A protein has these predicted regions:
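Alpha-helical architecture
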Residues: 2-3, 42-43, 60, 64, ...
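Alpha-helical transmembrane segments
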Residues: 8-39, 73-79, 85-89, 94, ...
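Alpha-helical transmembrane segments within multi-pass membrane transporters and channels
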Residues: 39-51
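Anionic group-transfer/hydrolysis microenvironments
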Residues: 47, 68, 187
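Membrane interface segments of multi-pass transport proteins and intramembrane proteases
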Residues: 50-57, 96
Length: 196
């Protein structure tokens, strides 16, 4: 439903504030990106409802705000985070295939954040069809972040150990829980869409 993301965002934030380590830079970054993009989406939906305007805020303004929010978040993350190999791009299943992005890390990260946000938006529409894909992706990210943040598992699987990333699995679990809570509200509408 319209403004349904606000309910998901609320459930997510309650869980993260209760269970996650709020001194962890990874959690703070995830909270910032999620809340800022969530508020932007809520404002867009609010404008659609209040002014009976199906387009909400203009596409140019929306993408501009997304770029600004993402650049600010990634820049702060790079400035405050203390990861030795932060700008390295690792390829799974290839032990020595590592690309150091350098300062290209910031635009690359911004592109990934904005692309992910808009992909979920396009998948979702008004009938909640993005819930299951979001749950599956969050489960994969939870596994990857837990393994990367565990020195024993990361050494065994020959992937880089990054201290503190295991905390992101709590954030991903909160995403899964809040999405599962919304499934009962979106199931009927999605089923009707499939029949038509």
């Amino acid at each position: 439903p319209t403004m349904g993301g606000v309910i998901i965002l609320f459930g997510l934030l309650i869980s993260v504030l209760l269970w996650a380590d709020l001194s962890n830079i990874n959690i703070l970054f995830c909270i910032y990106i999620t809340v800022s993009f969530g508020l932007l989406g809520a404002f867009d939906d609010f404008k659609k409802i209040k002014y009976s305007n199906s387009s909400g805020i203009s596409s140019k303004l929306k993408i501009t705000l997304q770029i600004l929010l993402a650049v600010l978040g990634v820049s702060l993350f790079v400035y405050y985070a203390d990861f030795q190999d932060m700008t390295n791009l690792y390829f799974p299943f290839f032990k020595n295939l590592i690309i150091n992005l350098g300062w290209f890390f910031i635009p690359f990260s911004v592109f990934v954040i904005i692309g992910s946000s808009n992909a979920v938006n396009l998948t979702d529409g008004l009938d909640g069809l993005a819930t299951v894909p979001v749950i599956l992706v969050a489960a994969c990210f939870a596994f990857i972040s837990y393994v990367t943040g565990n020195i024993v598992f990361s050494n065994y699987l020959q992937i880089p150990y990054i201290e503190g990333t295991g905390e992101i699995s709590i954030f991903c679990g909160a995403i899964i829980g809040s999405c599962l809570g919304s499934v009962s509200y979106t199931h009927l509408r999605a089923h009707e869409t499939q029949r038509n």
